[in-house]
Amino acid sequence: MSTAGSGSARILPDGDDARAEAIALLRAGAIVAIPTDTVYGIAADLALPDAIERLFAAKRRPPDKAVALLLADADQAGVLGIVGPAARVLAARFWPGGMTLVLPRRPDARLPDVLAAGAPTVGLRVPDHPAPRALAAELGPLPTTSANLSGQPDARDAAEIAALLGGAVALVIDGGPIRGGPASTVVDCTVERPVVRRVGAIPPARIAEALDAAGIAHDIEGS
């Protein structure tokens, strides 16, 4: 059963029907809000540049702020990024889960520059939630950013997202209230010695331990 308010997005409970509708809407260029294992996100189809522009506009995100892509599985990372030894170790250890890996962008990757704020890099994550993975399995890597206005607190549930983002979002997949945890930890693997750019769901000490165990040098505190 769906609900809607004046100027608000439709809300459908997470499940096969909601995911099928989300896929159709994304292919048509709409913006959809989805649950993840960290916070709710809003997503667009990577193949549609106009939709990506609407993604930035929906949350008033400045163009100098990069947007990561959610993946169905670790295999999709190699489509857009160059997966080096450190990234391979971290993906095997922490995906699916709350870690975004920043990788060098593949020269042949079809990726709008705005998603990386003009840098030759790409941020990728496999979330520990079936809804975004199902969408990415069907559509490919999914540009996704947190479902809030830029610089504001994260929306806590589907109704709040629908009210906050209004007509900018066509559908909200309702996965229940968020757990209130942090966003993903961001690890930069484009430098010689990986470094944490944002502390989040996965503590730096655990990341350092994984790299130490693999014999990979890094600049992450906690080892």
What is the predicted role of each segment?
Residues 1-223:
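Active-site-adjacent structural elements in enzyme catalytic cores
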